[in-house]
């Protein structure tokens, strides 16, 4: 599946210059392409869409939107390990929900998300220009314009979730001194809903290699499902019936199903997953950016996986989250047994032969130089021990992997859709038998006993266990009213800290932006 997409993508990058800055609103997109030689077939439109999707490759790397989502939740953190990982305090701030408008992770997330919006705007503008000139058949262009508008709606879903109150920029042909004003979270919600309602019906329902890792009808429905599930947070009123309707279209299509093996979704070659509704098709050569081994593994873990580069020893999970998995849950794995795939690397760590324990002679850990990833973390800062914290092992680290993985990253996965529907049904009626059955599908695959009833804590915990490190946990905590509470290495915080600050550099450059409360 990935080969088809790379062929079209690379063709687009070869034909079209996409090297301009994301912040340059006046760039020329097709200055070397004649309209009478291009946009005559679906393949040519697909090639032109390449830039809209290449922005996504920044999703999973260190310092990205994904990183900020995860580290500001209860399932991941980056402790300061002596002289390592202080980084101006930005990761300590993120985990404590004490965000600073000047922190790089806040600024980089904003630039990443609006860079994606701007690329969609560029392409929409160019397509519409060619249509107005009579150079492109409007009927041929409509589904591709809808694809871009839906992708832009996804960028705005992430923006409204993370930053809350943001500008709505839906045009590319603006003045050089254009300074968009802040819109309320409810206004951004309404914009996303309108874009999806107008665009999703025009998207293809075909699910095969030609639509893999592209926005199709069911991706649009997944975006709607997430938007409506979080409507109470975003606009102050629930929309659970709409969330259920969106999930039903995906479920009843028959195009998706649970993989029998949970970890099939996270293998190096996972592009054939029956669960993937929309994924980022990473590749160690052609589509780099998935840097997880560098981000989470201990320096000596290079010997476990025969990695080409030494990892950075940063990201880890927390004891409370790790212990939320019961023993026997296939997602938890077995401490000290690296031969068994798991969401975590925990316990004794070994060389690639599986027999010789890794040794860290400079270790500051009380249990000596033998490398042991302990769930308990001795300190958030300044001297977290080098081996403290179980590491993120959910995605397969291939033997001799480079810093860039070839695993595709799921943005929307069928298991998530089942849990979205279950939650929406439960919120309408806490005793709903269908909600319980949906959650138990997930638990059965994980090898744990079915629930006999559902509580809010059950739902939140099961979402956490299933969707670990897929960039939804912070949003889930907010929706369940748990984000503000005190937890390990985080004090109790005000509700206004549920969203991130607008970066100081953006406010300095645009007087029409308003800072979020609390900052």
What is the predicted role of each segment?
Residues 23-89, 189, 197-198, 214-368:
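An aromatic- and glycine-enriched ligand-binding surface/loop that stacks and positions planar moieties
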Residues 103, 107, 344-440:
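C-terminal substrate/ligand-recognition segments
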Residues 145, 152, 224, 231, ...:
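Structural register within alpha-helical repeat arrays
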Residues 21-24, 53, 57, 61, ...:
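Long, intrinsically disordered, low-complexity segments
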Residues 5, 15-43, 192, 225, ...:
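Bacterial Sec-dependent N-terminal signal peptides
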Residues 158-161, 165-167, 230-237, 427-430:
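Short coil/turn linking the two alpha-helices of tandem helical-hairpin repeats
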Residues 42, 46-50, 54-60, 83-163, ...:
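Conserved, well-structured interaction surfaces
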């Amino acid at each position: 599946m990935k080969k088809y997409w790379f062929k079209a993508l690379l063709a687009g990058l070869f034909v079209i210059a996409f090297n301009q800055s994301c912040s340059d609103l006046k760039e020329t997109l097709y200055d070397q392409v004649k309209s009478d030689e291009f946009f005559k077939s679906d393949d040519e439109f697909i090639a032109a869409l390449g830039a809209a999707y290449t922005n996504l490759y920044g999703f999973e790397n260190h310092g990205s939107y994904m990183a900020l989502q995860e580290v500001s939740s209860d399932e991941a953190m980056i402790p300061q390990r002596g002289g390592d990982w202080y980084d101006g305090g930005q990761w300590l701030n993120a985990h404590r929900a004490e965000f600073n408008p000047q922190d790089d992770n806040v600024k980089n997330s904003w630039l990443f998300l609006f860079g994606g919006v701007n690329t969609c705007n560029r392409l929409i503008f160019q397509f519409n220009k060619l249509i107005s000139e009579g150079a492109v058949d409007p009927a041929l262009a409509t589904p591709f314009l809808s694809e871009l508008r839906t992708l832009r709606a996804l960028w705005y879903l992430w923006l409204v979730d993370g930053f809350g109150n943001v500008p709505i920029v839906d045009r590319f042909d603006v003045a050089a001194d254009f300074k968009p004003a802040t819109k309320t979270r409810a206004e951004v919600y309404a914009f996303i809903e309108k874009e999806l309602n107008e665009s999703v019906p025009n998207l293809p329902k075909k699910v095969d290699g030609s639509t893999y890792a592209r926005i199709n009808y069911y991706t649009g429905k997944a975006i709607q499902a997430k938007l409506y599930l979080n409507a109470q947070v975003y606009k102050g009123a629930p929309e659970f019936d709409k969330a259920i309707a969106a999930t039903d279209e995906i479920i009843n299509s028959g195009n998706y199903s649970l993989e029998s093996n949970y970890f099939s979704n996270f293998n190096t070659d996972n592009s054939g997953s029956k669960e993937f509704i929309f994924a980022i098709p990473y590749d160690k050569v052609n589509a780099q950016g998935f840097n997880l081994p560098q981000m989470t593994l201990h320096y000596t873990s290079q010997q476990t996986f025969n990695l080409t580069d030494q990892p950075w020893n940063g990201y880890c999970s927390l004891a409370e989250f790790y212990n939320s998995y019961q023993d026997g849950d296939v997602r938890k794995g077995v401490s000290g047994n690296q031969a068994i795939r798991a969401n975590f690397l925990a316990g004794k760590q070994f060389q690639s032969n599986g027999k010789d324990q890794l040794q860290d002679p400079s270790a500051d850990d009380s249990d000596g130089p033998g490398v042991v990833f302990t769930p308990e973390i001795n300190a958030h800062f300044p001297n977290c021990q080098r081996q403290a914290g179980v590491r993120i092992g959910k995605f397969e680290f291939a033997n001799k992997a480079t810093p860039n993985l070839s695993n595709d990253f799921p943005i929307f996965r069928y298991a998530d859709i089942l849990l979205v529907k279950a939650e929406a049904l439960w919120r309408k009626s806490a005793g709903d038998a269908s909600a319980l059955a949906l959650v138990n599908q997930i638990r059965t695959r994980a090898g744990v006993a079915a629930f006999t009833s559902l509580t809010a804590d059950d739902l939140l915990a099961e979402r956490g266990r299933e969707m670990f490190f897929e960039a939804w946990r912070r949003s889930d905590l907010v929706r369940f009213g748990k984000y503000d509470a005190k937890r390990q290495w985080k004090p109790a915080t005000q509700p206004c800290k549920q969203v991130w600050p607008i970066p100081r550099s953006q406010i300095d450059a645009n007087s029409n932006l308003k800072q979020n409360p609390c900052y």
